[in-house]
Amino acid sequence: MKKFSLFIILSVMFFLSCSRDNNTPNPELPPPPPLERKILTGTFVQLFGKDNWSEAQWDEFLTEIKDVGMNTLIVQYTAFKNPYNNITWFNSANTFTATKSKNTLQRLLASAGRKAIEVHIGLHFDDTYWHHQTDVAWLQTQANHCIAIAEEIQAQFGTHTAFKGWYIPHEPEPNAYNTDEKVRLFREHFVDRISNRLHQLNNKPVSIAAFWNSSLSTPEQLQHFMAELSKSNLQIVMLQDGVGAQHVTLNRLASYYEAAQRGLFEENKNYKGVFWSDLETFASPNGEYPFHPATFDRVKQQLETALSIPKVSKIVSFHYFDDMSTKSPHKAKADALREAYKNYIKHKNAL
């Protein structure tokens, strides 16, 4: 009987090992959060206007974010197309963008390596996504573009010590994907087509940032949407907190975080990834462009709400350069937010 049992066990192990695509390594999940979570430990960055930044300029920027406790930089996209921009920010042979800024990503990664900043690299984004969110043919074409960009990035930067993850820059939300079938189409024809290929290229985690609008979606709808979205081959699911875009008021924010948490970890019992907060540090009178840095009082409430959610393991901001950096185009308001934030974390660290 023991020999028979051993035979069964070995047979099952052999079957499971064969059932996995041998070219697909296990995705490398981020390490568990430290016992004491910091506040903002990462930020997004957009490469507009940074095409010709030198490594010294990247050093200055990354030193600044590191000085406020950040260790992660998410490049929102490395290729972008809209009526005003048609560009790739590395040495790419692709034919779906017109302009190539050949050295931008290389310089960023070189600086990040020196500064011990972990970089998650975003792929290609065509701004007509907002008109084609459930258009399968369009999604398949754009998935191919993202894969092409990823293959080139892997060939050029795959072994770089600062390169720690991938980011899919297409932001899904429950109002557009308002049925299980629509989420399935997005998952199977877009997210998984990309992420499955990424996991063949390397074992780095793949992330996405979902959002919602409280005037269009209830907490219950967000919960179910997050449960369905997290059936995708994703290791990091971020939730934009929506405060800067005026998608939610501060007094309702916790209820949506809690709903997202339930969707990821209770309704979907199979999600093995992590839950990050994407905290909006910008503001505007109507939640639309042009934006400017928010007040610290508002950001503090957003931070404390995110930190109250047990499964939120990391909080990243959108985004430090515009809203908090010394080089912000909104210098006075950015300086005020940054200095108030630095005083806040200094006090927190002293406790």
Residues of each region from the PLM?
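Aromatic-lined carbohydrate-recognition surfaces of secreted/lumenal glycan-active proteins
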Residues: 120-132, 140, 164-171, 190-222, ...
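Substrate-binding cleft of secreted/luminal carbohydrate-active enzymes
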Residues: 164, 238-250, 263-351
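Bacterial Sec-dependent N-terminal signal peptides
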Residues: 15-37
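An active-site-proximal structural segment forming one wall of the substrate-binding cleft
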Residues: 99-115, 135-165, 190, 197, ...
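Acidic-and-aromatic substrate-binding clefts and catalytic sites of carbohydrate-active enzymes
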Residues: 46-59, 77-84, 90-103, 129, ...
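Aromatic-lined substrate-binding rim segments of carbohydrate-active enzymes
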Residues: 57-67, 71-128, 182-208, 252-259
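Short, acidic/polar
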Residues: 51-65, 146-156, 218-229, 294-306
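Active-site groove signature of glycoside hydrolases
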Residues: 124-128, 149-181, 316
